[in-house]
Structure formats: structure tokens, C-alpha cells
């Protein structure tokens, strides 16, 4: 007979003392929830034994459970051939006061076969202990063994509680002390629990023992597989009490709740910007460090976010899975489709308190506010130029690097931005999707339409501090300022000639290349400048560029305009 619970020594405890074993028939009697509970309890018990330093080697049962196999398959060295069936009423004679379920009794009898049961000759038709006197010795041995087992079972619940209390108490204390005794040899990272280290090691080994039967995707943690399965079932057990939105992960709900509180606990030490998610702060920090860990294998381009790389890859594939139900236009990103839909609805939720201008996206409002504040947080390390948007800085950097990833299939012209290529293609197609409601004039750029509308309003919000001259475009003001500074930052590598505008340099380069992308549909003549093509078209239409008020003569040649003006004014 074992001693009282207090006399149990932790050093002699084994995993089999806290494990239950099932046959195939018994295992099939359990429903899915019970099977999952069994797996979780057995794995937790083993982790607890490992934690207190009792389990020397991993049992086959644990390996089996970790791999998602059925536990009744496991070969156990303690198991021997099944003895003749012990009927339930005979077991009740042995344990008259217990009343355990039949299958559990069989588990107990099977687990403790070592007590001489291999020689047990139980008559099939025994109905009571009195009829089995001939087997008294064998019975006594079995009875003693099962009495010992009975005491173990009666103590099991209390023992497990004490054991869990012991192990959880120690784990809880470690949480407060911050002690991390378990170190990864691969990367030096430390953990306070051995089970956490074991999970971490799978990152280095690439081991993913938990596989989804539905789609075959594998994970290195059982909890990740459980969460993944909700994608197939559509289960979202975590619901926001504030707005009713549901999530399939508790962490997603926790993150979502911060939206309602407005709290932003994660602050950037570099610039002071705050975020409601630690992941967003991590991504933001890459702006300052310039780190881009996600690289495209197709073109070598690197990104600071994995989601941006995923979206970029679609460019190479040409895939556009997100289609607008309103107009049929397709997009490579769902976020772009969401933004596009606002064109049809006309919704603009985000309003500037400074000037009243409204925007369909919060990010656009944030960027717009920098016009009023003059803030330019994104600075180029190469030349010191600062920008209001990180994307503008990224594009600017390509000037120094000379990178042009996006090539036109029609004329082979290359661009540093995909949006520039899209705009350029409209030269070949003649597409002008942006139309003025006031006069009907159409443009191939939304920015051109915005600028054009100012003609009707007469608004000139961009004023030069040097001379007071006002402009309807910020870009025009920037170009104008160069007049005062005399700066010519755009230099031709071919001949050394410098220009104060990048567009002038682009046009100039065509002299060296001989390129003439602007072709007249009427006569086929080609030009290297769109403005020259527009003037040329007037030859066919008969339109005159300039007509003085003092005479009836008109000029269709821009070179003669100055001479006409002087002649009309009576100058020599």
C-alpha cells in the first residue's frame, strides 16, 4: 500500500503515473472535444514534468500526440498480450464500492498487469468470488494489485491538483522574477520555460508538426493550427462588445478594442509618433533605419513590409483579382479597390479643420495637413532634400540610384514608379478618364483635372514669399522659386547642360536619343515634346495661337509672336 500523499517524492514520479492509456475501442467512445481535452492534458502534464526536471526522455505517447496521431497506436514496452476478458460484474465484486465505468476499469486492469496476471486462470462463467476459491492465491495477488491501483486512482485527483499547484506556482514566480534559464544555442535568445524554448527551436529547424487536414498547411505550434482551422469553419468566437465585430483570434480583438479607446501605447523614440499596435511601430521604425527585409526574387526590389512584397508580386504576375462591381475595373490589391469604390459613392469622411477640404482616406488628410504645417519628416540622406510623404522619398531615392523598374511595352520607355508607367500608357491609348463637369474637358491625370478646376474658380492658393506672385499649383510655385535662386539641379550627363525642371531635362535628352514619342495622327509627323505637337495640330485646325487686339493679323508660329507684338505696338 502506498503512503499518504504527503510522502510522495517528486523524484520517483514518472509520466506513466499521470497518464491514461486507451484501446482503439475505448478511444472511439470519446467525442472530438474529449479527445482534444485528453491530448491537451497529456501534453501539459509532460511539460510540467519536464519543467520540474522529472522527465528524462520523451515518451512515445507524447511524440505521437505532438504529431497528431491516434494515441492507441503507440507501442508501449510495459504492455503485454491481453488476458481473458474480466467481466464487469467480477470487477464489481473486487471494487464493490467504486462503481467506475466499465471501460475505465478495463484501462486500470490493463495498466497494472505486472501482478502475476499472466498466470491467472479465470473461469469464463464465474459469477462471484465464492465460485473462484480454486484461484484464491491468484485472486489475492490481483486483489492486492488492484487495491494499490484503487488507492492511486483515489489519490489522483488530489495529487494532480497539488502537482499543478506546485508547477503553476513555480511558473508564476518565474513570471515575476523575469528569470530566463533556458537559452537557445542557435540565436542566444532566452526563455523562462523549457516548453517555450522547445517551440522557439522549431523556427530554426523549420519543423512544423501540426498539419491542417483541410488544406495541408503546417504549423510549428498546436495553437496556431487551432486558430487556422477557424478560416475553414468561419468561426469567430471573440466578439467586440462595443461594436459587435467578431474575430477568430483573441489578439485581434484586443488590438481592435484600442480603436474605441483611441489609446496609442506604442511610441517611436526617434520621432515621437505613436501607434495602437506594436507591429505597426516595428514597421514604422524601418523608415528611420531604412531596413527592407522583404526582397522580390523576380526583380530584386526590397520592401519594409511583407504585405507590400505580396502586393508587389502581383505586378509581375499581372493578376488583378479584385474587381469593381460598379464599373468592372480590376485591381491587384483589395485596398486599392476599396479606395476606388469611393469614386462611385463620393464619400469623403475626413475633413481638414484648417481649410475645410475633405478626403476619402485618413492617410490623405494626414498628408494634406503637412501643407499647412510645412512639416517634411522624410529626409533624403543622399542630398538632404525633405518630403511630406515616405513614398515620395522612396521615389526620389531612385533619382540617385537610377532605378527604373517599370518599362513600357509599346515604346520601351522605363519609369521609376508604376503609376508613372500607367499614366504614360495613356499617351499611346489616348485615354482621358478624368473629365471636368464644368466645361467637359478631359485629362489623363486626376491631378491635372484638379489643377484645371482652379481655372474656373480663379483660386491661387500657392504664394511666393519672395515676390508675392500666386499660383494655382504647388509644383508651379516650386518651379517659380528656382527663378529667384537660379538653381539648376537637373544636369544632362551627355553634354553637361543643366535645367531648373526635371521635365526640361527629360525633353532635352531626346535631342541626344532622337526619340520622338508624340505623333500627329493627322499627318504622321512626330515630336519630342507634347506642347510642340499641340502647336503643330493648329496647322490642321487653322487655329491661331495669338491675335493682337489692335489688328486683324494672327500668328500660328510661337517664334513670331514677340515680333508681331512689337509691330502691332509700333516698335522697330
UniProtKB/Swiss-Prot annotation:
Entry's Gene Ontology BP terms: regulation of DNA-templated transcription
Localization of this protein: Nucleus
Keyword rRNA processing: no
GO cellular component: nucleus
Xref: Pfam families: KRAB (PF01352), zf-C2H2 (PF00096)
GO molecular function per UniProt: DNA-binding transcription factor activity, RNA polymerase II-specific; RNA polymerase II cis-regulatory region sequence-specific DNA binding; zinc ion binding
This protein's UniProt keywords: DNA-binding, Metal-binding, Nucleus, Repeat, Transcription, Transcription regulation, Zinc, Zinc-finger
Listed name of the protein: Zinc finger protein 98
PROSITE patterns (alphabetical): KRAB, ZINC_FINGER_C2H2_1, ZINC_FINGER_C2H2_2
Naturally occurring in which organism (per UniProt): Homo sapiens (Human)
Classification via InterPro entries: KRAB (IPR001909), KRAB_dom_sf (IPR036051), Znf_C2H2_sf (IPR036236), Znf_C2H2_type (IPR013087)
Family, per entry: Belongs to the krueppel C2H2-type zinc-finger protein family.
Keyword Metal-binding (UniProt): yes
Main localisation: nucleus
Signal peptide per UniProt: none
Zinc finger (C2H2-type): 182-204, 210-232, 238-260, 266-288, 294-316, 322-344, 350-372, 378-400, 406-428, 434-456, 462-484, 490-512, 518-540
Known role: May be involved in transcriptional regulation.
Domain KRAB: 13-84
Gene name of the record: ZNF98
Amino acid at each position: 500500500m502506498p503512503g499518504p500523499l504527503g510522502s510522495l517524492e517528486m523524484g520517483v514520479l514518472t509520466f506513466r503515473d499521470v497518464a491514461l492509456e486507451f484501446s482503439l475501442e475505448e478511444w472511439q467512445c470519446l467525442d472530438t472535444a474529449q479527445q482534444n481535452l485528453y491530448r491537451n492534458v497529456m501534453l501539459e502534464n509532460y511539460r510540467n514534468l519536464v519543467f520540474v526536471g522529472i522527465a528524462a526522455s520523451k515518451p512515445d505517447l507524447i511524440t505521437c500526440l505532438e504529431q497528431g496521431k491516434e494515441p492507441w497506436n503507440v507501442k508501449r514496452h510495459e504492455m503485454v498480450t491481453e488476458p481473458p476478458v474480466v467481466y464487469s460484474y467480477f470487477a464489481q465484486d473486487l471494487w464493490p464500492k467504486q462503481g467506475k465505468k466499465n471501460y475505465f476499469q478495463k484501462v486500470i486492469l490493463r495498466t497494472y498487469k505486472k501482478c502475476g496476471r499472466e498466470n491467472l486462470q479465470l473461469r469464463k462463467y464465474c459469477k462471484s468470488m465464492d465460485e473462484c476459491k480454486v484461484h484464491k492465491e491468484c485472486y489475492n495477488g490481483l486483489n492486492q494489485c488492484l487495491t494499490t491501483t484503487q488507492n492511486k486512482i483515489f489519490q489522483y485527483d488530489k495529487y494532480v491538483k497539488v502537482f499543478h499547484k506546485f508547477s503553476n506556482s513555480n511558473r508564476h514566480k518565474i513570471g515575476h522574477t523575469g528569470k530566463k534559464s533556458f537559452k537557445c544555442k542557435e540565436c542566444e535568445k532566452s526563455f523562462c520555460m523549457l516548453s517555450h524554448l522547445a517551440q522557439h527551436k522549431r523556427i530554426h529547424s523549420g519543423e512544423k508538426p501540426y498539419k491542417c487536414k483541410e488544406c495541408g498547411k503546417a504549423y510549428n505550434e498546436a495553437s496556431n493550427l487551432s486558430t487556422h482551422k477557424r478560416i475553414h469553419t468561419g468561426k469567430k468566437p471573440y466578439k467586440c462588445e462595443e461594436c459587435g465585430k467578431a474575430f477568430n483570434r483573441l489578439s485581434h480583438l484586443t488590438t481592435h478594442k484600442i480603436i474605441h479607446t483611441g489609446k496609442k501605447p506604442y511610441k517611436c523614440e526617434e520621432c515621437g509618433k505613436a501607434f495602437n499596435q506594436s507591429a505597426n511601430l516595428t514597421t514604422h521604425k524601418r523608415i528611420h533605419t531604412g531596413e527592407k527585409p522583404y526582397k522580390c526574387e523576380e526583380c530584386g526590389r526590397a520592401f519594409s513590409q511583407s504585405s507590400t512584397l505580396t502586393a508587389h508580386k502581383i505586378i509581375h504576375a499581372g493578376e488583378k483579382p479584385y474587381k469593381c462591381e460598379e464599373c468592372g475595373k480590376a485591381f491587384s490589391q483589395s485596398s486599392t479597390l476599396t479606395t476606388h469604390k469611393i469614386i462611385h459613392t463620393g464619400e469623403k469622411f475626413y475633413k481638414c479643420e484648417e481649410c475645410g477640404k475633405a478626403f476619402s482616406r485618413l492617410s490623405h488628410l494626414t498628408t494634406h495637413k503637412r501643407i499647412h504645417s510645412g512639416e517634411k519628416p522624410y529626409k533624403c540622406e543622399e542630398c538632404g532634400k525633405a518630403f511630406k510623404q515616405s513614398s515620395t522619398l522612396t521615389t526620389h531615392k531612385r533619382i540617385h540610384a537610377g532605378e527604373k523598374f517599370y518599362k513600357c511595352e509599346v515604346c520601351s520607355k522605363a519609369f521609376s514608379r508604376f503609376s508613372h508607367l500607367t499614366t504614360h500608357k495613356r499617351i499611346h491609348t489616348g485615354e482621358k478618364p478624368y473629365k471636368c463637369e464644368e466645361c467637359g474637358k478631359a485629362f489623363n491625370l486626376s491631378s491635372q483635372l484638379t489643377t484645371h478646376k482652379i481655372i474656373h474658380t480663379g483660386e491661387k492658393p500657392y504664394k511666393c514669399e519672395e515676390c508675392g506672385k500666386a499660383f494655382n499649383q504647388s509644383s508651379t510655385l516650386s518651379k517659380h522659386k528656382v527663378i529667384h535662386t537660379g538653381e539648376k539641379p537637373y544636369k544632362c550627363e551627355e553634354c553637361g547642360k543643366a535645367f531648373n525642371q526635371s521635365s526640361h531635362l527629360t525633353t532635352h535628352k531626346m535631342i541626344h536619343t532622337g526619340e520622338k514619342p508624340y505623333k500627329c495622327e493627322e499627318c504622321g509627323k512626330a515630336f519630342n515634346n507634347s506642347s510642340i505637337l499641340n502647336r503643330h495640330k493648329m496647322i490642321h485646325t487653322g487655329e491661331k495661337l495669338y491675335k493682337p487686339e489692335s489688328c486683324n493679323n494672327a500668328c500660328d508660329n510661337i517664334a513670331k509672336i514677340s515680333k508681331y507684338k512689337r509691330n502691332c505696338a509700333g516698335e522697330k
